[in-house]
Amino acid sequence: MIRWKYELHSLIWLFLVLHLSKCQSDSLTTSAEQHELFAIKKDSLSPWSQILVSLPRRHPLYQSFAAKIQDVTENISDEVRDSNKTFVSSDDAPYSIRIHALRAGHRYSIAIHGQKDGSTSLIKEESVVMDPRAPDFRSMDSDIQVAEHNITMRTIKNDSYLQDSFSIEYRQINPDKKFPVLQILDIPEQKNLEFYLGNLNSGFDYSVRVIAHKDGMSSRPWISTLTTKPSPLKEVNINQNAGSCVEVSWQNDEFSGADFYTIQYSLQSTPNNSTNMTIPSTESSISICDSMLQGEAYQIIATVQKGGQVSEPLITKFQLRPLPPIDFRVRADLKRGKYKLLAELPTSSKIDKCQITVAGDEAERSVNYANIEQTKSGHKICWFNFALSPGERFDFSISSMANESASQKLQKSIVLTPAFDFNAFGLTLQESNGGIELIWPKSEVFMTRVKDIWNKVVGAESLLNMRITPIGNNDETDKTLKFETSPKNIDPVFAKNLVKGACYRVQLFTVTKTGIISETRHNETIRMSSPAVNVSLESVTRSSATLRIVFSTHHDSTSISNCQMHIVVRDMNGKSVFDKRMQLTATFAPLLNLDGLSPFHKYTVNTQIICGSGSSETPQCPAATRTMRQLSFSTRQDKPAAVQDLKVEPLNSYSVMLTWLPPALPNGILTHYAVNVTKIGSDETRTIDVGVSSNRSDHTVQVVIDELFGGHTYSFSVRAVTEAGFGENSPVVPTVSMPLMAPPVPTVAPMIMKESVGSHNMIVRFPTTMFDNRNGEIKQFAIIVSETTADESINRWIESDNGTYTWQQVQRFDVWPSYVAKLQDIQKVKQDVDVSIFEELGEDETCLEVRADRICNGPLRSASKYRVRIRLFTSPTLFTDSPPSQVMTTGSATPAIPLLTVVAVLIVIAFVGIVGTIFLFFWNRTKKARLAAAAFKNGPSKEKESQWEALKMMMAERAADCLAKLGLDATTPPPSSTTSSNSPTSTSTTMTDCGSNPHLGAPNAGGHRRTRSLRERTGVEHRLERLSSGPVHRTPLYTVVTGANTNKSRPVRIEDFADHVRLMSADSDFRFSEEYDMMRNVGVGQSVAASELPINRPKNRFTNIPSYDHSRVKLSNPNNIEGGDYINANYVPGFSSRREFIAAQGPLPTTRDHFWQMTWEQQCPAIIALTKCVEKGRDKCHQYWPDHENVPVLYGDIEVTIVAEKEFDEFVIRDIRLEKSGPDGRVTRFVRHWHYMAWPDFGAPSHPNGIIQFSRMFRHHLPHSPHNAPTIVHCSAGVGRSGTFISIDRLLQSSSFGDPIDVFGTVCEMRYERCQMVQNEQQYIFIHYCILQVLQGSSPSPTSTSTGAHHNAGFVQDGQMIVESGF
């Protein structure tokens, strides 16, 4: 069954195949896409290397097909024979098999096999000869050589290709010409193939076809168009026309073809720098006009091009003629005594030299050559000198030459004119004695030279002619004066009797004997001089003057009829006040009145006589002007105008500062000023004479008016005075109310009358001269009584030094503190009359019956010592205490202490001990709470503070009373803790807690409170003194400006500053200490990251003085080195700028170069040094400047030189030059070094005068900086002395402008920029004393205690104590 099915399937397939074959044969002619099954055909594109086998789409017997290839070529070697190959069908191309990589000309046997289920059967086998392949003459191994009449083609045959022969077909394209076909047999053993095509025409295109043949088959042809090389040009002709163009023509070979011609021309000297031109083959010439320079030597290279072939070049060299000279002229050369031919040459041509030919009637023809010169303006010239005779005719011919090629000639026939030069001949033409005179030179040597030149270029027989013709006067124009002269006769030529002021034209020229006139003439117009006049001052007043004008000599009217006088009068500012022209006549003698002049002004009179200014004058003859001698005069003085900008400013309660500017119109020399001072509300007026000198740059006059009285109002007027009298009153009459202040300190102390001293009373006497009303009228006086101890000190129980009690309030004390015994109004008394006042103390026996807070003059204690002082009042709050009287003891001795009193005292002492023990136990338990409360001002409440103060006061009072009764308070204090009794210091405090008069205070009879122990002050052991009372918050003093934020700023008006310092100094500078402690934490906690870098720590002199990051000075650091921009310095604000100063530490040896780098980069004009290099054996600052003057030292890249040095008592000033190399060269700057050496470390100078002088001198000499460059200030750490100096400088500037003085705010502001500025309390107090010293002038410096701390012993005025008043 299976076999039957297989045979049936084969029959069906055979039927289909036969049917398909019949269909394909039927449609073969109608469809190109139908292929015979398994057809073997050579590829149409590559018939020499590829065969294509067609396969059926679906074959019932085979699944795939393969084509086996075998090279069956006969008579070839095995090396040439191709290897066997097999190609199979693929899914990518299932309908054909492409056989490739076959060899041209080889015969191959191709067998097609079918495959199915592993069995293979041969389907078809056929033999095919591959087409031959023509050689490729464009390949790398090929070469085509083209000549004018032949072409040679060479290549290397491919060993694998087979051919029998080659045929070469070639023909000329245009015009068409056919050549015989070349047949060449192939020689297999010959690898190189060469074809030669001869008998060709030059310059034509040829079509070449090369075909390979094999077994009757021909290859596809190799086709190319080849061009023969054209023939070179036969000749090139070059013609230079009359212009600047060059005509280039050529002749080509008539049998040679050409597409275009190439012309390449260049200078023969620079053949590589050429210009190329392409010309169509239809042209045979070209013009070159712009690119060739006349006179240069050129070469032209001409070639013919056909296709890509170029003929042999034809080189032609030629020389262009230079351009002829533009023009020439012949002039006489007086210096050489010859005629000079000067030719101007064109710049657009090369010219080497000039050829000059000269011929005359009597002179032989001569040829000369001259070199070329170039003028400053860029023109080319040539010149030549000839020894020719003037007055004769000569023919000149000149041409340019370049490389022996001559240009066209420029010819002229010239008659040589005689020479003439007015200046060269040394002639002088001048007005003389009413005429015009021509003068020859006086020097014989010069005249010898003139005669020699005259004979050569003028002519020995030639003459000099002078013509003088009047101008502008019609009736005289024909009256020309003629004169002749020559060097043979050197007498002057004089034309006399000319009209004064008239204008004449003078002509000078030379003439030969043949009548030839010189080409050069001297023309000059001369106007005869004007008549002279004298101008004199006839009279002068304050506002007018009279001038008289007369002629110097007599003139007739005709000689001056055309002249005018121009007179101009100007004031001292150059402004014209009189300007007038007047016609001159023979009788001209006017008087000129000048009115409206200003008093005491200088005037100048300028007079000119102008002749020839009429309308009939010609512009050729300008007017003649004669200037007369200038006359000056001054008007008389007058009363001055009012002064300007009158201002008044009170200085204190009894003096003012009056300022004004001088009058705008002084109207004379000011002798003085009269100042009228009037007290408002009275007829009292006084006049003060003030000098006119002023040492200020703005000429402001300043005067201090004294002897005024506080509390009164005054008006001021100022008048300037000249010798003419008093000027006007000032338009503004300023008034000022004098401030009311505490009375001046009396110079005398009250005196207790010894004979009046009793057991309970005494009489005190004091003069009325202590009632000084300068600071205001004294309204009251009070008598202050103080009991003293055995050492004559005053009981200090009351907290305030100025606080006082009443008589009844002091009864509870064993030693009475100060109390007011009497308060009495003062009647007006004359201060210059010495009248004594007597007052009895202790006269009132009824004081126990009145209220305790009432003032009462109760009995004194017997056998007790007392001091008395007088308190003077200008108002209830303004008072001053006199010095205390001598100590006086009342009568009768103190009785013995009874036994019961001693027992009572012992009981009190035991009670005090028990209370103290209980308190100490409580103190230890609350220690932490107290420490926390002490860190803040707003800690414990005021109520607890008052309770604790009351407890301490009560315990100290009881102990003092007991010890006093036992006689244990008589211990003498150490010498260092006491001060003289006549120099106490007091403060103003209102005692509201003791019930005393709030307007009365008690003076402090002791010295500095901090230097005395509690036992010395109260008789109690010092251990009680150490008991803390917590932070005490004090309200700012009344002297601080109201409304200020007292946590950051405490400004004080200038007029209140003295009182402010006194109040701050009271109680041993307690308020100074309290205020300084408030700034302890200002600025603390700000970032100091740069200072704490490990690489920067060695750059800090002190580890606790870092540099704040936000304000530190940064050095330039171009290489970005870590820490390279760090220096321990900060910007600190001053008066004028936020960065007016740089506060820096004293340089270390390792930071010295950084210090100078900072100085250079910040462009600092000055350096302030406030420390010595070594103090007390310790290094405080490295010496960063050179040791010797004018010896440069290099610090880093900055050269430092001291150019000058000046020493003072306390400081040294050095001028230092800094030099540094930069991109623009070496840059030089100057820095002034201020070195103050009298300032101790951690302290203050002993006296402010030195540092004030130093600060003022620095500020006066500080140069102006256009960049607002900062000044460097340093000490050792750069905080203490540096901060103090900056504060002083800033506050002195502020006070000079009248601004409030804010020491507290200034220091706070600095501490925000650099830590610990103003390092201790002593320096803080010193700032106040410096400012006060400047404001008051006479105040002495603060002194120092034995411990070295700042000590305030009080201010001294007029040699006496100042006692400050309370609120």
Swiss-Prot record:
Domain Tyrosine-protein phosphatase residues, every copy: 1072-1334
Ranges that cross the membrane: 902-922
Residues covered by region (Disordered): 967-1016
Keywords on record: Glycoprotein, Hydrolase, Membrane, Protein phosphatase, Repeat, Signal, Transmembrane, Transmembrane helix
GO MF term list: phosphatase activity; protein tyrosine phosphatase activity
Compartments where found: Membrane
Active-site feature positions: C1275
GO CC terms in record: membrane
Membrane topology listed for this record: Single-pass type I membrane protein
Pfam families: fn3, Fn3_Dep-1_1st, Fn3_Dep-1_2nd, Fn3_Dep-1_3rd, Fn3_Dep-1_4th, Fn3_Dep-1_5th, Fn3_Dep-1_6th, PTP_tm
Glycosylation sites: N75, N84, N150, N158, N273, N276, N403, N523, N534, N676, N695, N802
Phenotype upon loss of function: RNAi-mediated knockdown in a lip-1 zh15 mutant background causes the descendants of P5.p and/or P7.p vulva precursor cells to adopt a mixed primary and secondary cell fate. Multivulva formation in 19 percent of animals. RNAi-mediated knockdown in a let-23 sy-1 mutant background partially restores vulva induction.
Cross-referenced InterPro entries: Fn3_Dep-1_1st, Fn3_Dep-1_2nd, Fn3_Dep-1_4th, Fn3_Dep-1_5th, Fn3_Dep-1_6th, FN3_dom, FN3_sf, Ig-like_fold
Limits of the Fibronectin type-III domain: 229-325, 531-630, 642-740
Family label: Belongs to the protein-tyrosine phosphatase family. Receptor class 3 subfamily.
Subunit details: Interacts with pat-2.
Name under which the protein is recorded: Receptor-type tyrosine-protein phosphatase dep-1
